Amino acid sequence: MRVKETVRELHPCFGQARNKGRIHLPVCPACNIECNFCDRKRNTYENRPGVTGAILSPEEAVDALKKALELCPEITVAGIAGPGDTLASDGAIKTFQLIKEHYPDLLKCMSTNGLLLKERADELIELGIDTLTVTVNAVDPKIQAKIISGIYYHGKRYEGEEAAKILIENQLEGIRRIAAAGITVKVNTVLIMEINRYHIKEIAKAVREAGATMYNIIPLIPQHKLKACKEPECKDIDGARCE
C-alpha cells in the first residue's frame, strides 16, 4: 500500500511537505504498558518522548489548536501521541471528534503502542484518522519480554512472555484492520542494541505483511531500566536499516 497523495502533500513526516506544519496535542494521561525505556514525567524543561508540561482536555486542545492556526496558518496536521497511550483513555478520540467538526481539512495523525488497537480500530476508521503510527519493538515474545515489564489489559496486569504475546497479537491484527481501511500506517521501532538489534528484519517483514506503508527505526534514549544500554550511533541505525 502506498502513502495517499493528500498525506504526501500535507504531512511533513510522510512526504515532501517541507513548508507545512503540525501540532501535537497532549491529551492522553494514562498508559497501559510499562516499557523499560520509558520515564514519563510532567515538566517544562525536558524535550523527549513521554514528557509534557500539561495535560489538556479535548476542549482545551481545540482552543490551543485555534490559537496555533492563527499564529501559524501553515499547520496542516493535528497530531496526538501522548504523553500516555492514545487508546488507553478517550482523550484522543474526543479531541479528534472536535477537530473533525471544527477543522475538517486538517489531517488527523495518531500514534499508539497498539495494545488496544485491535479492539478500537473501528473507532479510528469511523473517525477518519488519516495516518497512524504504531510502535512495534519486537514480534518475538521472548525479545519483547525484555523490553516491557508488563501490560495492563482489561483490568488485569500481565507480565513476561504472556504480556508480550498479547501485545504483539493486538499490534499486528490492529495494523491489519487499519491498513485494510486504506489508512496510512507507519511503524516505529526503538533500536536497542543489546536486545533487538538483530531482530529488525523480522519486525519489518511482519509489519509489512500486516499492511504498514512505512517503517522507521529510532534510537533508544538510555534511561529508566535500560539506562545502562548503549545509545545507538548513526552507523548502528544505518546498519539496521540496511538489513
Which residues does each predicted region cover?
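Short glycine-enriched, charge-decorated loop/helix-capping segments at active-site entrances
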Residues: 48-55, 148-151, 160-161, 229-233
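Auxiliary Fe-S-binding modules of radical SAM enzymes
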Residues: 1-19, 201-243
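Conserved beta-strand segments that form the floor/walls of ligand-binding pockets within enzyme
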Residues: 26, 79-81, 186, 190
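Canonical Radical SAM [4Fe-4S] cluster-binding loop centered on the CxxxCxxC motif
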Residues: 11-57
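Conserved AdoMet/S-adenosylmethionine-binding subsite of the radical SAM
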Residues: 87-218
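Short Fe-S-cluster ligation motifs
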Residues: 60-81
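A short acidic, helix-capping loop that chelates divalent metal ions and anchors anionic groups
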Residues: 45-48, 142-145, 155-157, 223-228
